[in-house]
Amino acid sequence: GPLYTEQVEPVFNVHPQVRRTALVGVGAAGAQRAVLCVELAAGVHAGEFARIERELRQLGARHPHTARVATFLRHPGFPVDIRHNAKIGREKLAAWAAAQLRQGQ
């Protein structure tokens, strides 16, 4: 079934070294791959992402709906709507995630 951002993201946002996450779909409608984009908290080095990703997978495995999220990508800083700084630019993030996956990131 479908995954909803408001059900998925809070599960991962509790991680102390994560600033925020954004669930995006990559691929053709109906056959989309769930990708969780992860923005690390201030001061957290990108080199720590492999460990953080493992911990996020463990968090996700505790819930049936988040266990299905298999792809995690570190993003340096989410694009946001200029008018509403907190509103994440999900379309841009989805395009970025698709490009990362094409490059075999």
Name the predicted role of every residue range:
Residues 20-26, 36, 57-105:
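Conserved C-terminal "lid"/linker of ANL adenylate-forming enzymes
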Residues 1-65:
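AMP-binding/adenylate-forming catalytic core of the ANL superfamily
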